[in-house]
Amino acid sequence: MGLSEKVEFKTLDGLVLRGFLYSARAKGPAIVMTPGFNFPVSLLYHEVALGFQAAGITALVYDPRSVGRSDGLPRSDINPAKQSEDFSDAITFLKTKPVVDPKRIALWGYSLSAAAALMAAGLDPRVKLVVAVCPAPVPYNFEAPGKRRKYLDLAIRDRESQARGKEPFYVQYIGDSEETALFDYRKQRGMEELEYDEVVENLTKIAPGFRNEVTIQTLRRLGSWSFADVPQRVGPTPVLQVFAVHEELEHIRKTQEAIWAGLTGPKERHTEDRGHMDVLTPDGHRFAHLVKVQVDFVLKNFAQRMR
């Protein structure tokens, strides 16, 4: 953390987003990074940012709106379309930094934020490339039997309740049953034998500010988010898409293959022998190689742009 500084910037709609800037030693390319679904900046993302910084790439990593240190109410109210817009405001902020070449700015995302990064790349011509780690436009199984109707009914009840001045409805994020939570942690690779309290405690340790809940309106937005044509809109922007061999949820695996097939511009595919939840775990040589793959992709493509 000694190689970074705390920063903040405003979104167009007036929220303050907070994070860390890892400035390179000399002027050069930069990359904007945000965590996955309902997750604040953690040690995992700092390790990746340090890898970019060491290679001469300035990295900005920040908490998404309503998560962690960033502003936004209600808390843990996830809005992928707004997260995509926030990427653009982060680019505007980075362009003010003397160490950043404004013509060489990339986006990096994981899970939901990877999908938001791809959407931003299709709408913001300042995005010159994207690193998409295990993109998941809808990171939970909204189509599971009974879930869509259950959550949509709750969302309407919540809107009526909030109209009467009540607090927003929340749903548990990670739990030990899909009946009561979005994710059953026991189905995630490496977590099968853990106790629920241990899982939440570990997440809170690595990501201070983690909240194990999201608003019901989050689910309504994700259920209505149209992502099918986003890969085609990315157009000529180069994309590195990282896959996990042991991606736990079938609907995410299918979506990732559809994203890959839909990308019409320059693209590279890299596969990790991990699951969705542990693909970014700093575990020695494997993780170091994954960071190198990303760094090499960014440097190679930006070098080509300089010719």
From Swiss-Prot:
Keywords: Hydrolase
EC number: 3.1.-.-
GO MF assignments: hydrolase activity
Reported function: Thiohydrolase; part of the gene cluster that mediates the biosynthesis of phaeospelide A, a fungal polyene macrolide with a 34-membered macrolactone ring and an all-trans conjugated hexaene structure. The HR-PKS ApmlA uses acetyl-CoA and malonyl-CoA as its starter and extender units, respectively, and provides the large carbon framework in phaeospelide via 16 cycles of polyketide chain elongation, which is the largest number identified in fungal iterative PKSs thus far.
Coiled coil regions in record: none
Gene3D superfamilies found in the cross-reference section: 1.10.10.800, alpha/beta hydrolase
Keyword check for Hydrolase: yes
UniProt superkingdom: Eukaryota
Keyword Hydrolase among record annotations: yes
Database matches in InterPro entries: AB_hydrolase_1, AB_hydrolase_fold, Polyketide_trans_af380
Protein name: Thiohydrolase apmlB
Protein family according to the UniProt entry: Belongs to the polyketide transferase af380 family.
